[in-house]
């Protein structure tokens, strides 16, 4: 722990953390895209699989899945990253069209919230237009096609987006 009370990993610690993150994200991708387990359920199952696979199985699974760049929630695999112009949804301005890039892992722990996000199509790859911001209610309204929905800022600040053209 350093002077700022932050934990710094050794090179070996970083390697191990990246390995676990890769196993977890790969398991989520496999469960969702190959086995058809719903997007909002794969996180809890991946926690079990990430510790139960050997390096050989991980290598073969990655090859079988054609080396995905992200998990189903948009989290980049180690070695990949979000676009540099990525920001969080709560920073999107009225009238702005954005594409969802990633739902941060903190939100993945709530299946109920993920179900709501899926129902509203607030998932990686989907485009939304920001309609209005209601600071008094700490929320914003967004629209996709004909569907409008209100989203609290404390959720929107955990969704990474990029601005796109209409």
Ranges and model annotations:
Residues 1-2, 133:
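Generic beta-strand structural signal
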Residues 5-24:
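Basic, amphipathic "hinge/linker" alpha-helix immediately C-terminal to the N-terminal HTH DNA-binding motif
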Residues 44, 48, 146, 166:
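Electropositive, surface-exposed helix/loop patches at the edges of structured domains
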Residues 25-69:
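Amphipathic alpha-helical dimerization/coiled-coil segments
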Residues 156-166:
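Short, charged, intrinsically disordered terminal tails
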Residues 51-158:
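Mid-protein regulatory/catalytic core that forms ligand/cofactor-binding pockets
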């Amino acid at each position: 722990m350093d002077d700022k009370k932050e934990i710094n990993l050794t090179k070996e610690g970083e390697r191990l953390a990246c390995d676990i993150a890769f196993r977890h994200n790969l398991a989520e991708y496999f469960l969702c895209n190959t086995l058809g387990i719903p997007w909002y359920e794969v996180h809890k199952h991946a926690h079990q699989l990430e510790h139960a696979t050997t390096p050989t199985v991980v290598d073969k699974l990655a090859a079988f899945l054609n080396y995905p760049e992200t998990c189903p929630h948009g989290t980049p695999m180690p070695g990949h990253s979000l676009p540099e112009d990525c920001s969080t949804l709560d920073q999107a301005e009225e009238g702005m069209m954005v594409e969802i890039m990633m739902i941060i892992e903190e939100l993945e722990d709530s299946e109920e919230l993920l179900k709501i996000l899926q129902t509203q199509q607030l998932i990686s790859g989907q485009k939304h237009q920001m309609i209005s911001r209601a600071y008094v209610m700490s929320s914003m309204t967004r629209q996709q096609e004909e569907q409008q929905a209100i989203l609290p800022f404390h959720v929107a600040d955990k969704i990474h987006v990029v601005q796109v053209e209409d």
